[in-house]
Structure formats: C-alpha cells, structure tokens
C-alpha cells in the first residue's frame, strides 16, 4: 500500500486522479464522502471533481479498504 500512497501523492492532475481512482476500485478500494465514517483510512486525495467517478462528490473524499 505504500507504493499506491506515494503514487497518489505524486499525481496532481485531475486526469491522473480519475485514472488512479479507477485503478484503486479494481484493487478493492472504495471511495467515501468526507462526512462518513473513515475505517482503515489510507490517504486523502486532493479535491478534484473531473470525470464521472467524482461527479457525485462536492468535497474531498477518503479512500478506505473495502472489507465487504
């Protein structure tokens, strides 16, 4: 997970954020709104609302490891 975190921190453009989001979803990482519970918090991505993956979020989101 350290590698993913470093890659995320290194990416700053919206395009990379959306691509990273798609990759993380494939790896079983879920996106939750900032106001929700944050179990197993990995890292906090920059605010970015480009692309369909972020269309429903108006603020920064947290990524958590899916256990379902």
UniProtKB/Swiss-Prot annotation:
One of its GO terms (cellular component) is extracellular region. GO terms for molecular function: acetylcholine receptor inhibitor activity; toxin activity. The keyword Transmembrane helix does not apply. Expressed by the venom duct. The 3 possibles disulfide-bond connectivities isomers have been synthesized: (C1-C2, C3-C4), (C1-C3, C2-C4), and (C1-C4, C2-C3). It is found in: Secreted. It comes from the Eukaryota. Its main location: secreted. Keywords: Acetylcholine receptor inhibiting toxin, Disulfide bond, Neurotoxin, Postsynaptic neurotoxin, Secreted, Signal, Toxin. Disulfide bonds join 31-47, 48-60. Residues 1-28 form the signal peptide. The cysteine framework is XXIV (C-CC-C). Alpha-conotoxins act on postsynaptic membranes, they bind to the nicotinic acetylcholine receptors (nAChR) and thus inhibit them. The toxin with a disulfide connectivity C1-C2, C3-C4 (shown in the sequence annotation) block the rat nicotinic acetylcholine receptor (AChR) alpha-9-alpha-10/CHRNA9-CHRNA10 with an IC(50) of 1.2 uM, whereas the one with C1-C3, C2-C4 shows a lower activity with an IC(50) of 3.9 uM. The 3 disulfide isomers are poorly structured in aqueous solution. Belongs to the conotoxin B superfamily. This is Alpha-conotoxin VxXXIVA. The lineage of its organism: Eukaryota, Metazoa, Spiralia, Lophotrochozoa, Mollusca.
């Amino acid at each position: 997970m350290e590698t993913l975190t470093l890659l995320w921190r290194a990416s700053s453009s919206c395009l990379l954020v959306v691509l990273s989001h798609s990759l993380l979803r494939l790896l079983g990482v879920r996106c939750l709104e900032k106001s929700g519970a944050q179990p197993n918090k990995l890292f906090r991505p920059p605010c970015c609302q480009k692309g369909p993956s972020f269309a429903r979020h108006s603020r920064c989101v947290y990524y958590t490891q899916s256990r379902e």
